[in-house]
Amino acid sequence: TRNKIKSISDEWWFGFEQEYFMYKDGRPLGWPESGEPREQGDYYCGVGCDNVVGREIVDRHTEACMNAEIGITGTNAEVALGQWEFQVLGKGVKAGDDLWMARYILVKIAEWHGVSINLHPKPLGQTDWNGSGMHTNFSNNKMRDSGSEVLMEHMCEKLGAVHSEGIKEYGSDNDQRLTGLHETQSIDQFSYGVSDRGASIRIPIY
């Protein structure tokens, strides 16, 4: 929240990757009334009515965000049927404002279609279906201009030292998603690595 912000600069760039499920009648959109759809695999970045549902909502959301001058940079279908992600890029405080407005617009547009938006980290419980997170990309001038392995590792070590404090600020029920499975690290552990999808922090290839 704004009252926690002491100083922040447009030098700080944030790229948010917000995952979510679309729900209708208490189930993920497109799921059968009983049981589950076929296993995940074809849904991720999928096309075609057998692989994705809700694209009209996604497209209307993207257009509305662009019209509102929100820095939306993309969307994609996620690993479960009815699960999607949108990406927002912003600088400084505006990044957070854009994220919240993008969420609000998404909920409103889904409402027009009789669909609800579920941001719970693990809405399907402890099943073999991925949950929904929000990976956050970050950089500052030093990282963009002269980023190095030493710099990245130094920053990761600093974050690791306050891992438990940080987790407390990230919302409730993350323990249900951060189990060490489904491309996550355990909530009580911290790790980082290059292109490591199971780490707390994934560092791009240098």
Predicted regions and their residues:
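Glycine-rich, acidic/polar active-site loops that bind/position phosphate-bearing ligands
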Residues: 1-206
